[in-house]
């Protein structure tokens, strides 16, 4: 049976809506009383796994799920061995460098060498600062990253930004955008090559039905 890994959190509702448009219904995951992490759709065509967003590519890479929906930010951070098929056009956000608004810096290039940068996206932050040839100390934080500069533990942060409201409320401003992120459709490479569970059909249908979402978002 086809298995689809779905991300908990902000992408879940749109992911389920998209899958419903191709005949796969996992809306039971949206029921506030639901405690199941694995369910079958009513047609018994596929099963869904409800997992943390960071774990979606892990389940797909190891073949426990043939399909997955996950943010581009997760793919950039984890660099999993999966096949990427489509930009699904929802879940828009951006990975940015931010500093306190009273900071003298107005570009990441202006940050002092060996300064401290807090982030839960350690690899993305490291790659960015390596690219601009600025040595920094990356401090891994997995809660409220904004507290890094507020408490003086770091001069800057690298984090996902959607509306910018959280940054503003905490006295931070964006300096640079590393990349834009949206939801992506991924697949297990071998399953795709073998067309297991009619995988090519589902990839084509999901990709095709995502186009109206992408057009609406733009």
Curated annotation (Swiss-Prot):
Pathway: Amino-acid biosynthesis; L-histidine biosynthesis; L-histidine from 5-phospho-alpha-D-ribose 1-diphosphate: step 1/9
GO MF terms, alphabetically ordered: ATP binding; ATP phosphoribosyltransferase activity
Xref: CDD domains: PBP2_HisGs
Reactions catalysed, as given in the entry: 1-(5-phospho-beta-D-ribosyl)-ATP + diphosphate = 5-phospho-alpha-D-ribose 1-diphosphate + ATP
SUPFAM superfamilies, per the entry: Periplasmic binding protein-like II
Keyword Amino-acid biosynthesis: yes
InterPro entries associated with the record: ATP_PRibTrfase_cat, ATP_PRibTrfase_CS, ATP_PRibTrfase_HisG, ATP_PRibTrfase_HisG_short
Location within or outside the cell: Cytoplasm
Alphabetical UniProt keywords: Amino-acid biosynthesis, ATP-binding, Cytoplasm, Glycosyltransferase, Histidine biosynthesis, Nucleotide-binding, Transferase
UniProt signal peptide: none
Chief location: cytoplasm
Any one of the GO CC terms: cytoplasm
GO biological process, alphabetically ordered: L-histidine biosynthetic process
EC number, UniProt record: 2.4.2.17
Pfam family, one: HisG
Keyword Amino-acid biosynthesis applies: yes
Annotated family: Belongs to the ATP phosphoribosyltransferase family. Short subfamily.
Summary of subunit composition and partner proteins: Heteromultimer composed of HisG and HisZ subunits.
Domains as described in the record: Lacks the C-terminal regulatory region which is replaced by HisZ.
HAMAP family in the record: HisG_Short (MF_01018)
Function of the molecule: Catalyzes the condensation of ATP and 5-phosphoribose 1-diphosphate to form N'-(5'-phosphoribosyl)-ATP (PR-ATP). Has a crucial role in the pathway because the rate of histidine biosynthesis seems to be controlled primarily by regulation of HisG enzymatic activity.
NCBIfam families in alphabetical order: hisG (TIGR00070)
Entry protein name: ATP phosphoribosyltransferase
Organism of origin: Acaryochloris marina (strain MBIC 11017)
Gene this protein is translated from: hisG
């Amino acid at each position: 049976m086809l298995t689809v890994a779905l991300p908990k959190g902000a992408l879940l509702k749109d992911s389920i809506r998209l899958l419903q448009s191709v005949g796969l219904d996992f809306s039971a995951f949206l029921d506030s009383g639901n405690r199941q992490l694995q369910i079958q759709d009513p047609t018994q065509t596929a099963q869904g796994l409800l997992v943390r967003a960071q774990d979606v590519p892990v389940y797909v890479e190891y073949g426990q799920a043939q399909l997955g929906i996950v943010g581009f930010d997760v793919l950039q951070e984890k660099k999993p061995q999966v096949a990427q098929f489509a930009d699904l056009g929802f879940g828009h956000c951006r990975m940015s460098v931010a500093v306190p608004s009273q900071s003298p810096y107005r570009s990441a290039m202006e940050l002092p060498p060996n300064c401290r940068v807090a982030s839960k996206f350690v690899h993305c932050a490291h790659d960015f600062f390596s690219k601009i040839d600025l040595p920094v100390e990356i401090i891994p934080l997995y809660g409220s990253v904004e507290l890094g500069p507020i408490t003086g533990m770091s001069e800057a942060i690298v984090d996902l930004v959607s509306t910018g409201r959280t940054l503003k409320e905490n006295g931070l401003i964006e300096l640079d955008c590393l990349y834009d992120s949206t939801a992506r459709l991924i697949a297990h490479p071998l399953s795709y090559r073998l067309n297991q569970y009619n995988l090519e059909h589902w990839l084509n249908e999901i990709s095709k039905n995502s186009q109206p979402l992408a057009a609406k978002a733009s």
